[in-house]
Amino acid sequence: QPANVDHLLTAHGLMMSEILTNAGRFRDKAVGIQKGKEVHHVAPPAHQVSGLMADLTQWLKQAKDHPLITSSVFHYEFEFIHPFSDGNGRMGRLWQTLILSQWHPLFLSLPLESVIKDHQQQYYQALEDADQQADSTPFIHFMLSVIAQTLALNAPVNATLNAPVNIEEMKTPEAILHLL
């Protein structure tokens, strides 16, 4: 269940057990994101992580927005909190896929992670833009674009094989729903 903190911790433990000594536990130290010597994001203090993650999963349980939006907001907030000492990006992307797959099982087989990797600089830029604006909208737009592109490349239900795809027109939840 994506709205269950214990499931999140268990998944992190399974994913990171060969890499981290504290896999499956929230971080107990300050962390930030640096590019060279420049700090781009300072995560909330470690003593706040447990409460922030409880708040985030509670929000997820009660979210009324479309799953495309909800999953993107969750992903952004998760990355902002940066709850683990390592593996936050992997976990955030995995959890977004999990949220989306509960809405539509097709997302279990879509390579969102691969498309994000192909656009890694834009991914980090969208996170940074959202941080600077104190608004998750830039990140939501980026993720909708990635989802639309992934669907267009892997599940072109209503298109012929040679039809051009306009990614800009596919960034809305309605356009993505049409692909499903």
Located regions from the model:
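FIC/Doc superfamily catalytic core
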Residues: 1-180
